[in-house]
Amino acid sequence: MSFLEQIIERAKSDVKTIVLPESTDLRVIKAASMIMKKGIAKVVLIGNEKEIKSLAGDIDLEGVMIEDSLNSEKLEDYANTLYELRKSKGMTIEAARETIKDPLYYGVMMVKKGEADGMVAGAVNSTANTLRPALQILKTAPGTKLVSSFFVMVVPNCEYGHNGTFVYADCGLVENPDADQLSEIAISASKSFEMLVGAKPQVAMLSYSSYGSAKSELTEKVIKATQLAKEKAPHLAIDGELQVDAAIVPEVAKSKAKGSSVAGKANVLIFPDLDAGNIAYKLTQRLAKAEAYGPITQGLARPVNDLSRGCSAEDIVGVAAITAVQAQYVKA
């Protein structure tokens, strides 16, 4: 069973409700139908029911819930909640009433209120517009200071990682993390790996240096981040700074990182900045013909995930399944 097939089966075992707010896009409507038919999640589309059904045509939307963010009886309650959350930032109640009509804000508020368990958007909207409501309304998860992202990389015919499966972070969100932020990314990514892959995380803090083979401000940041992560999560298997070959290849680890409990068997790879992470995941995807699932958001109080604007309906189904599994781990 592939990684995604396993995720879909897990989603079906404890069905959650996922909001798809971009109902003016046919890919989203197709995905909503597929998610319902496969029993992956309950689905809420946000928009005008007549317009959605007209666009859907012959697509079966039986069981899909539709909420109209422009004419909902919940608008005043949602607006009041948004106002209370944002008044310290200068938001007025009038502005809150207008803002909450935006399907992205309305969808996130459904998640905030417990009327849905997660949201998936980005087929039409930018990453910034997709995640802004989540950051403003949901905030970070308990014990987490930073929202970041990761990819699950499944490399065919690969003896490294967990049977060729890795988590790469951060490849999509935090541009130039400082040492403290890098430690937060590492801890969150380890939890994400355990949650989605179901194996023990072995975290490598990557650099162009292994154990002081080179010294610079760049390597010092990774060393400090490793120390901070160990202090914050003493039971976490984490080491650094490590070059990527020392991190994943046992023979190289023996010479470059003697005594390391992680080197040679890392399955969670933490990159020093967004440049390195983004380049690495795309190289792995293209040259190694790996499956890349992401960017998946981590660190939010409840899951909200972003899509590529070039996504297919099938891609949306996959991200919805991952979001549903993330929602299974949210503590009430």
From Swiss-Prot:
Its main location: cytoplasm. The keyword Cytoplasm applies. It holds the Pfam family PTA_PTB. GO terms for cellular component: cytoplasm. One of its GO terms (molecular function) is phosphate acetyltransferase activity. Its EC number is 2.3.1.8. It catalyses: acetyl-CoA + phosphate = acetyl phosphate + CoA. Transmembrane segments: none annotated. It is found in: Cytoplasm. The keyword Magnesium does not apply. Belongs to the phosphate acetyltransferase and butyryltransferase family. NCBIfam families: PRK05632.1, PRK09653.1, pta. This is Phosphate acetyltransferase. It comes from Acetivibrio thermocellus (strain ATCC 27405 / DSM 1237 / JCM 9322 / NBRC 103400 / NCIMB 10682 / NRRL B-4536 / VPI 7372) (Clostridium thermocellum).
